[in-house]
């Protein structure tokens, strides 16, 4: 594994932070909070507080690996739960919308079906999530917010719905839509920054055309739906430059970007290298790719015998095994996966210290030396 230059920088800059530390795997890290925003990938159980309708993720087999459905779109824990553990937070990240929940070490504001441009009534768009955070902001001190980590994973719903509703969209229309989504994303990040957040972790979009639901609905068989993948790639290409610009114009703005697209693509193309036997269909559901109906009481869903051999648990969401692997990469991997620094390095990077390295195009040869 390559050693990032930012790793050395993180060691040199850690000394001012020697108070309020937690020890994780022998390493001292600041005791800060974790706040997540986005869609169903990060929803810790918020959606059930926005509707009275029965939601499939509240029922078995969701939560199967933990024998406890908690409203998460997985067979068990999700990425933020593992990140919280790595950060020394003694419990899974709680849903912010749950009345009376302990949010002292952060919370999840993410909601299933959320998008950037606008969401249905039983969800919250990204800017609505940020406004909800602002309504609760008195729970945390200003300096605590500034030192905490803010993770964002969103955009899947925007592009999936656009593709379904505009199957024959011309290239110019696709480009215009990507621009509108990313411009709004930038505005929402600015809103969160103006609320006091300064340390951001942004997930790029996965190859959306490779989701089991995309293969099933667009009838691509074993192939991915490349039109959807192209939209994801266009979106991803704009995120890094947006964040670079913000870091260059706001001295206390710090960020890193997780290359979720290529992490998923590698596991799809070379699945046995990562010990996944099945990457093109879901563990739970019905249909050609078992991509519909998981958890619905009126659907006799097929459930795989061993979910840990699957990359996807349901139509759009990864298994707990995959989510844990992603969390390890986010927290401690090299720039081949997350750049310009990982979350461990971001945690110890001094507040108000300008960034010295920025996001680079992952097609750059030097970022392609190691595969994760």
UniProtKB/Swiss-Prot annotation:
Superkingdom to which the source organism belongs: Eukaryota
One Pfam family here: Lipase_GDSL
Matching InterPro entries: GDSL, GLIP1-5/GLL25, SGNH_hydro_sf, SGNH_plant_lipase-like
Its EC number(s): 3.1.1.-
One BP term from GO: lipid catabolic process
Keywords carried by this UniProt record: Glycoprotein, Hydrolase, Lipid degradation, Lipid metabolism, Secreted, Signal
Protein name: GDSL esterase/lipase At1g54020
């Amino acid at each position: 594994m390559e050693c990032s230059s930012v790793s050395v920088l993180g060691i040199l800059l850690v000394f001012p932070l020697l108070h309020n530390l937690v020890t994780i795997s022998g390493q001292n890290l600041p005791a800060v909070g974790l706040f997540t925003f986005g869609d169903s990938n990060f929803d810790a159980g918020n959606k059930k507080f926005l509707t009275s309708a029965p939601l499939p993720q509240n029922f078995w087999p969701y939560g199967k690996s933990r024998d406890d459905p908690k409203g998460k779109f997985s067979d068990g824990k999700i990425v933020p739960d593992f990140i919280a553990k790595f950060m020394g937070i003694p419990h899974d990240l709680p849903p912010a919308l749950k009345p009376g929940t302990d949010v002292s070490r952060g919370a999840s504001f993410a909601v299933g079906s959320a998008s950037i441009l606008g969401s249905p009534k039983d969800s919250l768009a990204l800017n609505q999530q940020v406004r909800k955070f602002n309504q609760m902001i008195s729970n945390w001190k200003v300096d605590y917010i500034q030192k905490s980590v803010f993770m964002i994973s969103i955009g899947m719903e925007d592009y999936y719905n656009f593709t379904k509703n505009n199957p024959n969209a011309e290239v110019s229309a696709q480009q215009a839509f990507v621009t509108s989504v990313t411009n709004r994303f930038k505005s929402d990040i600015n809103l969160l920054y103006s609320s006091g957040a300064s340390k951001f972790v942004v997930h790029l979009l996965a190859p959306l055309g490779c989701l089991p639901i995309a293969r099933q609905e667009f009838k691509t068989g074993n192939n991915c739906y490349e039109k959807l993948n192209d939209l994801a790639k266009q979106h991803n290409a704009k995120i890094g430059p947006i964040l670079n610009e913000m870091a260059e114009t706001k001295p206390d703005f710090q960020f890193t970007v997780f290359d979720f697209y290529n992490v998923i693509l590698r596991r799809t193309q070379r699945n046995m290298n990562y010990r996944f036997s099945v990457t093109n269909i879901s563990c739970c559901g019905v249909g050609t790719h078992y991509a519909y109906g998981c958890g619905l009481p009126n659907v006799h869903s097929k459930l795989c015998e061993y979910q840990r051999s699957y990359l996807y648990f349901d139509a759009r969401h990864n298994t707990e095994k995959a989510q844990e692997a992603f969390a390890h990469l986010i927290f401690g991997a090299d720039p081949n996966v997350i750049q310009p620094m990982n979350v461990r390095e971001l945690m110890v990077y001094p507040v108000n210290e300008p960034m010295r390295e920025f996001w680079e195009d992952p097609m750059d040869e030097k970022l392609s030396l190691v595969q994760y």
